Amino acid sequence: MNIPERISALRALMEERGYDVYMVPTDDFHQSEYVGEHFKVREYITGFTGSAGTAVFTKDEAGLWTDGRYFLQADQQLAGTGVKLYKMGEPGVPTVEEFIASALPEGGTLGFDGRVVAIEEGAALEEAVASKDAKINYSEDLVGEVWADRPALSEKPAFALGEEYTGESTESKLARVREAMKKAGADVHVIAALDDVCWITNLRGDDVDFFPLLLSYAVITMDEMKLYIDERKLNDDMKADLAKNNITIHPYNAIYEDIKNLDTASTVLVDPTRLNYALFNNIPGGTKVVQQVNPTIAMKAKKNDVEIRNIINAHKKDAVAMTKWMYWLKTNIGKIEITELSAAAKLETLRKEQEGYLWQSFEPICASAEHAAIVHYEPTPETDVPLTQNGLFLTDT
């Protein structure tokens, strides 16, 4: 199916299920900035590949909201799809919430997958629909039903980081998190942010391109931690290390039902920007909830001596690769054909020579001549051009 056909299929489901407006954000179930292939739902339904944006569909309108980094790209990729670009922050452009409020009929229904909407955004949508006495249904992923060949969730294995890299044990990190919970007056902490779970457990993965993250959730109490993850990702040594810290392993999606069984006498700490709306709404009614930034955010920000030493070493290794690459460019430009893509490939080859290299941290931006004026330009076989001795060459890697 092409993009217009996909949108038509979505609208047919909207009609069948009683939705007047349906919203498709960029996020995964963990409110990640970048998402794995399984979660590229907004990209599938609009054709826009940028890392930020929200799509909204009505019975006869389709819109995509994105920021200034992607105006040019979105203009190009949305052409012929029937999706209108709404340039966020520009004069006269409504916000997503304002558009939804105006598009909903009295007593209508807004739909979205509550797993890919943060608590904070969910609250803003509740306020938006209230003016129309409308309802929210966050239980269905309609685009997922349209997407017949949707990639499965990543099954790539985890890997553990020793204290020679982390500088702190999981036991110590859990003790600090629990102390922060006490200060917040909470005895349960629900975490969905992938980087927070990975930091606490000293585990890493490859479930999101360019990021060492594992698809997982955590529920921490004062005496145990439940880790929700595909158990096949963990080897026996990892499981043993988790068990030493009274961390039990549970199926990845089981958290949604488990949360419903929390003791209503408990006080639950959640981050409204880093926990999804569906999970939040599964917390039993009457349970006291404290909404604040995950304590791990500040803990991760303050690097220990081991981390600082490793950061310095990593920069030195990358400096070696960059220096070799710039020398290669200067000595070979004009002698052999070097294109945007081949220059990027050469740099990665040189980085791979350095001990401990894993992968690049984002898709290389190698832009020659007029391509350098395109924000977040990424060369493709279709756009790749040769470098010239007199032109500008921009690199961000």
Residue ranges and their predicted role:
Residues A186, S361-E363, Q389:
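Sequence-level motif detector for i,i+2 pairs with an aromatic at +2
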Residues S342:
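A conserved beta-strand->loop->alpha-helix hinge within the catalytic CA
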Residues G391-F393:
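Structural motif
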Residues E348-K352, I365-Q389:
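Flexible, glycine/threonine-enriched loop-and-boundary segments that flank and lead into catalytic domains
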